[in-house]
């Protein structure tokens, strides 16, 4: 049987957090993450007071750091971010805070011409004609 999955895809932070709960055949053959996702994961252990949750988040961060080299948020990604921001602005949406981070991750995928895998496809409806969004 032919494998129809994209060869490479960028995982949104929501997918990385839930990676052990997602069927492997729903994901691309080769996993990629943005440096922005790595930043969100690095912040995660500091965003909880629960010791066990902090340890779980730190473990996830270390496993991802050991297994994936993040795609940089470089000049091409910055240009792509501008394009995505403009699209949202035209639809009267504001890309600030966590929303801006989502757009930066999507911009990284766009700049590398890769699909973006997410658990939150509704967050990307406004840009789904620009970036290929795959819900998992």
Positions of the model-derived regions?
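Short, well-structured N-terminal submotif of metal-dependent ribonuclease cores
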Residues: 1-62
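Acidic, PIN/NYN-like endoribonuclease modules and their adjacent C-terminal/linker elements
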Residues: 1-4, 106, 110-136
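Active-site neighborhoods of divalent-metal-dependent phosphate/nucleic-acid chemistry enzymes
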Residues: 3, 69-115
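Alpha-helix capping/helix-boundary segments
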Residues: 15-16, 77, 122-123
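Short, hinge-like loop/turn segments at secondary-structure boundaries
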Residues: 49-52, 89, 134-136
């Amino acid at each position: 049987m032919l494998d129809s999955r994209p060869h490479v895809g960028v995982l949104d932070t929501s997918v990385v957090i839930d990676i052990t709960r997602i069927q492997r055949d729903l994901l691309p053959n080769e996993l990629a993450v943005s440096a922005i996702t790595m930043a969100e994961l690095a912040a995660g252990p500091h965003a909880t007071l629960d010791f066990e949750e902090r340890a779980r988040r730190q473990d996830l961060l270390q496993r991802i750091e050991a297994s994936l080299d993040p795609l940089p948020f470089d000049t091409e990604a910055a240009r792509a971010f501008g394009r995505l921001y403009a699209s949202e602005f035209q639809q009267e949406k504001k890309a600030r805070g966590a929303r801006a981070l989502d757009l930066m991750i999507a911009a990284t995928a766009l700049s590398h011409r890769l699909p973006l895998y997410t658990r939150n496809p509704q967050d990307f409806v406004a840009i789904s004609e620009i970036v290929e969004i795959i819900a998992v």
